[in-house]
């Protein structure tokens, strides 16, 4: 490709004007950052990013993460000008564009492919959903970890299949967020030299210049994280940008941060370098003045001059196509020389699991003393991961407690000298862990992350994003209730279950015994487009005798009749529970049965799976004509009224817990068979009284 600075500048200004016009027409959005970063993104894409626009899901492509998601028009403009093809639901390229000019004209409109912040799956070329600042940085660390795992697992001396890089574009807001510290620290420790962050230091936020609230020496901070740092004083300096990108790619022992100083809203004479350029349209007059400053026709909107598409095709497109074709030839040869590895990789790409992946999941014998569900979860996890090589994960420094350490032969630890390890050590960085797990899932691995349920609050943003993106992240949350005991209310989750259940598209499973744990893991692995939380206990739970009670396979339907009235009688009362409280309901059921009272126990490990069942099944489990109902759960009451009705009883937590042995806490808060029995009897009497008055 011939050197042509004038044509390069034309491309840069096209990005700027498309961004201004789109925000102005939508009457909402963020024009300033795309205007500032257009030269940075252009030179990265045109000269360095390895990406074939005709095959946008090519496995060895470089990943570009727009962590500064409010600058979405920057990405949409690039995708349009680079003529990136859209892919169909099966991931195959189509003849249509990922982003058309019409899509840009409908920026931020209902049903468009150009939403206000980039959304994974909605727009081809968007590698991850961003918007909440800092999340893209955490995702990029997970993506870089995945790249290293692919290299370690699949590369052969005669066939180095994988060597892609991950670039993330971030801003002052990203750097202020705590997750950037966690993610950068982890990446530096792991020496992820395939990771390059480009930090737009424009020193302007919504409230004004950053000196109001931010005075960090970012480069010193990152050197302390074991990062290589580079500095570009002017975002419009093409030679300095080129030198920085070349040097960053040459670093082999640590990640790189490139600090770029830009002027937000560059070219807008009255609004550049002010907060007015950040999160609102510039205004018709200011847009015209900015276009005049660029030498642009002031009366043309959504204008792409001749030669711009061709310039992208000659650089970005031609480079990417050549790299992808070279890789495809290597892969074809690899397929012949290493067919088993090639088949494994094909399964990963197809979002499949190996045949027999669940064949070693144990069945647990009845045991009144039982086992903590965190322990049974650890056994099931190891049985699955030993058969699914791309199932990797770890904990926020809690693997010995959450029982998520993979112990099978060859599992190993993922470290800078062993990127093929399956055990990820996230350190005490829950927020970064959640975001990195998303990055791993976006790379088609089947990852998990674990901590105590109480600390799920530290990672709520990435959990929410995993549901928005429909990626199969698995979160293992242990120490799930006041069962934590003496650690007291700071460590006893109360409202966390309700919060997680409130996330659309997130499967929350709280199994009641070891065999339900096994089924919970089956459910979590079954859907490659749904994240899951497996919530388990610290304390032992009795393993129910499945010869007397229903099979745990009912877990797959979210809720099921565990024990029922004899002879098909209509139950006088329904006892429903999750987790550690299930065995309490079984004890009460047996007492009622001994008194000749027809009762039913419903295990409800997953409300959202149950809600996806047909109405006939739901009514068969919870008959509408049975009003006497008792719900038992060591958590907040929110949501249970849906199942017990307005007059049903709830044995739940209405306050925070306390520091004491579990046996005392059960008595204090009413989670004993005696208390639940009384609640059941009161419900039966309430219904009798109501009927006598009818």
Identify the role of each PLM range.
Residues 3-17, 49-51, 98-122, 400-415, ...:
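Acidic-glycine-rich active-site phosphate/pyrophosphate-binding loop
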Residues 5, 22-31, 59-68, 122-134, ...:
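A short glycine/serine-rich beta->alpha loop
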Residues 14-28, 200-202:
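N-terminal capping segment at the start of a domain
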Residues 18-23, 53-61, 115-129, 161-167, ...:
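Glycine/charged-rich beta-loop-alpha catalytic/anionic-binding loops adjacent to active sites
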Residues 37-189, 405, 440:
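Cofactor-binding active-site loop characterized by glycine-rich and histidine/acidic residues
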Residues 65-67, 194-201, 476-477:
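Short internal beta-strands
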Residues 100, 106-129, 145, 149-163, ...:
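Thiamine diphosphate
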Residues 325, 329-472, 550-564, 568-579, ...:
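Non-catalytic terminal/interface segments that mediate subunit docking, oligomerization
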């Amino acid at each position: 490709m011939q050197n042509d600075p004038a044509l390069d500048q034309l491309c840069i200004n096209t990005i700027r004007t498309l961004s201004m016009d789109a925000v102005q027409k939508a009457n909402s959005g963020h024009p300033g950052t795309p205007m500032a970063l257009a030269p940075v993104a252009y030179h990265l894409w045109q000269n360095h990013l390895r990406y074939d626009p005709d095959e946008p899901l090519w496995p060895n492509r470089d990943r570009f993460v727009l962590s500064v998601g409010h600058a979405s028009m920057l990405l949409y403009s690039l995708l349009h000008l680079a003529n990136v093809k859209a892919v169909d639901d099966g991931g195959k390229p189509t003849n249509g564009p990922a982003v058309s000019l019409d899509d840009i004209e409908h920026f931020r409109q209902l049903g468009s492919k150009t939403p206000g912040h980039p959304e994974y799956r909605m727009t081809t070329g968007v590698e991850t959903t961003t918007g909440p600042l800092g999340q893209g940085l955490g995702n990029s660390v997970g993506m870089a970890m995945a790249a290293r795992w692919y290299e370690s697992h699949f590369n052969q001396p005669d066939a180095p299949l994988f060597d892609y890089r991950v670039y993330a574009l971030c801003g002052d807001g990203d750097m202020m967020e705590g997750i950037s510290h966690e993610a950068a620290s982890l990446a530096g420790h792991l020496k992820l030299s395939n990771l390059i962050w480009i930090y737009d230091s424009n020193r302007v936020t919504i409230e004004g210049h950053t000196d109001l609230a931010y005075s960090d020496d970012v480069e010193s901070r990152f050197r302390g994280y074991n990062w290589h740092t580079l500095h570009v004083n002017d975002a419009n300096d093409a030679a300095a940008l080129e030198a920085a990108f070349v040097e960053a790619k040459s670093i082999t022992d640590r990640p790189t941060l490139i600090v770029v100083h830009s002027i937000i809203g560059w070219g807008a004479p009255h609004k550049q370098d002010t907060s007015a350029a950040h999160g609102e349209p510039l205004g018709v007059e200011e847009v015209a003045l900015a276009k005049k400053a660029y030498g642009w026709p002031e009366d043309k909107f959504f204008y792409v001059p001749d030669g711009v598409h061709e310039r992208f095709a000659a650089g970005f497109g031609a480079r990417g196509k050549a790299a992808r074709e070279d890789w495809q030839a290597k892969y074809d040869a690899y397929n012949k020389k290493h067919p088993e590895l090639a088949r494994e990789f094909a399964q990963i790409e197809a979002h499949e699991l190996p045949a027999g992946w669940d064949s070693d999941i144990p069945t647990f014998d009845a045991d009144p003393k039982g086992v903590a569900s965190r322990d049974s979860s650890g056994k099931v996890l190891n049985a699955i991961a030993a058969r699914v090589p791309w199932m990797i994960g770890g904990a926020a420094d809690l693997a010995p407690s959450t029982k998520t350490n993979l112990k099978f032969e060859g599992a190993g630890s993922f470290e800078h000298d062993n990127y093929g390890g399956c055990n990820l050590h996230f350190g005490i960085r829950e927020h970064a862990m959640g975001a990195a797990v998303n990055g791993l899932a976006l790379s088609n691995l089947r990852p998990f992350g674990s901590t105590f349920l109480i600390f799920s609050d530290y990672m709520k943003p990435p959990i929410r994003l995993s549901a928005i993106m429909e990626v199969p992240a698995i979160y293992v949350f242990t120490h799930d209730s006041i069962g934590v005991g003496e650690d007291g209310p700071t460590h006893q989750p109360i409202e966390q279950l309700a919060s997680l259940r409130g996330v659309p598209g997130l499967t929350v499973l709280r199994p009641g015994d070891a065999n339900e744990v096994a089924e919970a893991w089956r459910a979590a692995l079954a859907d490659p487009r749904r994240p899951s939380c497996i919530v388990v206990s610290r304390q032992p739970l009795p393993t129910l005798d499945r010869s007397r009670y229903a099979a745990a396979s009912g877990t797959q339907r979210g809720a099921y009749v565990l024990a029922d009235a004899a002879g098909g009688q209509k139950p006088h009362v329904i006892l429903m529970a999750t987790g550690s409280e299930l065995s309490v309901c079984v004890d009460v059921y047996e007492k009622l049965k001994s008194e000749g009272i027809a009762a039913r126990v419903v295990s409800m490990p997953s409300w959202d799976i149950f809600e996806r069942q047909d109405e006939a099944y739901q009514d068969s489990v919870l008959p509408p004509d049975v009003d006497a109902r008792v719900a038992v759960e060591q958590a907040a009451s929110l949501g249970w009224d849906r199942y017990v009705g307005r007059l049903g009883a709830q044995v739940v937590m209405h306050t925070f817990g306390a520091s004491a042995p579990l046996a005392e806490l059960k008595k204090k808060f009413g989670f004993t068979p005696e208390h639940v029995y009384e609640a059941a009897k009161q419900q039966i009497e309430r219904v009798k009284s109501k009927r006598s008055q009818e």
